[in-house]
Amino acid sequence: IISFDFFTCGKINPIVALDVLKKEIKHKRIIKKEFNRDAVDYYDDIYSSPGLKKFYLVKEVFEDFRSKVGQHVQILELEQFGKSLFIDNELQVAEKDEHLYSSTFVNSGLKLNPEKNNSAIIGGGDGGVARECISKGFNYIDWYELDPEVVDVCEKHLSKVGQKATKKNSVKCVWGDAFESIKKVEDSKYDKIFVDLNDDQYCIDLASKNINSLKRILKPNGTITAQV
């Protein structure tokens, strides 16, 4: 048995030294345990690429769990962006600049068509799009969200984003697979549909695959706003 204690400062990763030793010593079995002696940590962004490494400086971890529907949910306080939601290791929303996204998302649809009797939100678990729909005066908002646990932790830790949108009388939450749920919706129901899904290729493909289902429940001259 050989034991090593690697200590590094800043962004230097001790795994580099471990990789060198693995090649030289050629042990059949290696057990490693990592811990941080500092008050902050570095979160490795999954969109890093060869020649470009991107990190978020983490000040505090508020939530880190796997939800009942299988999503890895984290609420982290980032040095630059404040409290932020990560799902499956992808940054979804940060309290510092969220309003720029949500307000633009909703306003873009209203500029094309000002009708706002009702709207459907597909996803948007942080509550920002729902908040904007409420502030713009939509009479009825159907919010189709897969994971209620995401909504709960965002209401707890990112309260400025959602502003308790689920508690508003104009909002109806429909939990579960949104594209299964809308199969039960009548034709031409909504003035606006906002598709605010996770930032991954699977969700982009999912929305594209179901575009005809979304068009079916949209009123003539209605608008669909989606993140692509």
Question: What are the language-model segments listed below?
Answer:
Residues 2-46, 70, 93-228:
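The AdoMet/dcAdoMet-binding core of the Class I SAM-like
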Residues 26-87:
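Non-catalytic substrate-recognition/targeting regions of SAM-dependent transferases
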Residues 80, 90, 110:
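Residue-level marker of positions within ordered structural domains that often coincide
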Residues 85-88, 195-197:
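Gly-rich Lys/Arg/Thr-decorated short loops/hinges at beta-loop-alpha junctions or inter-strand turns
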